């Protein structure tokens, strides 16, 4: 089982889009060979709220498109097999204002950009990062592979 708790603080995300994001992340979970039951949250916020979160928790006083808080970060890997509890991956926070701007810049739909950002945040929850050039190449390559296999491409 894969549980995703959605929360929209903006009122801009259509109910049907939750299903697309859920399907994409379920696909990504399989692609990443996560067989355990898992749980995460996806919250949609505006620029003001994401800047406040970024400032408070990351010491970066600026707006961004997506922030992820991995619950397993810097923790030893835990074997959940045999336990009747889900693996709690963490929280993904997406700024709908920035998502709309990026969708316009890339020439694709707002819905599609939300999918890209949700997957990007999901990969962060799994430990991918882009702090170095090598890490960026690995993460973005993985992101593109999953998006292409799922059929959600830019443009």
Swiss-Prot record:
User: What's an example GO BP annotation here?
Assistant: rRNA processing
Give the protein's biological function: Single strand-specific metallo-endoribonuclease involved in late-stage 70S ribosome quality control and in maturation of the 3' terminus of the 16S rRNA.
GO cellular-component term (any): cytoplasm
Q: What InterPro entries does the record point to?
A: MetalPrtase_cat_dom_sf_prd, YbeY, YbeY_CS
- Native species: Staphylococcus aureus (strain MSSA476)
User: GO terms for molecular function, please?
Assistant: metalloendopeptidase activity; RNA endonuclease activity; zinc ion binding
Protein name in the entry: Endoribonuclease YbeY
The positions annotated for binding Zn(2+) are: 120, 124, 130
Tell me the cofactors it needs.
Zn(2+)
**Which superkingdom, per the lineage?**
Bacteria
Q: Where in the cell is it found?
A: Cytoplasm
State the similarity comment: Belongs to the endoribonuclease YbeY family.
Q: What is its EC number?
A: 3.1.-.-
Pfam families listed in its UniProt record: YbeY (PF02130)
Note the SUPFAM superfamilies from the entry. Answer: Metalloproteases ('zincins'), catalytic domain
Return the cofactor note field: Binds 1 zinc ion.
Keywords associated with the record: Cytoplasm, Endonuclease, Hydrolase, Metal-binding, Nuclease, Ribosome biogenesis, rRNA processing, Zinc
């Amino acid at each position: 089982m894969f549980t995703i708790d959605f929360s929209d603080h903006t009122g801009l995300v259509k109910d049907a889009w939750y299903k697309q994001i859920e399907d994409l992340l379920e696909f990504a979970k399989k692609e990443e060979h996560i067989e355990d039951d898992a749980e995460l949250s996806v919250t949609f916020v505006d620029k003001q709220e994401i800047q406040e979160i970024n400032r408070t928790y990351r010491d970066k006083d600026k707006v961004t498109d997506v922030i992820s808080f991995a619950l397993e970060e810097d923790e030893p890997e835990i074997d959940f097999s045999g336990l009747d509890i889900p693996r709690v991956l963490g929280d993904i926070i997406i700024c709908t204002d920035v998502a709309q701007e990026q969708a316009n810049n890339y020439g694709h739909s707002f819905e599609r950009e939300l999918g890209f950002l949700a997957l990007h945040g999901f990969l962060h929850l799994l430990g991918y990062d882009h702090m170095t050039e090598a890490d960026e190449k690995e993460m973005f390559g993985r992101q593109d592979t999953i998006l292409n296999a799922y059929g959600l491409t830019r443009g």
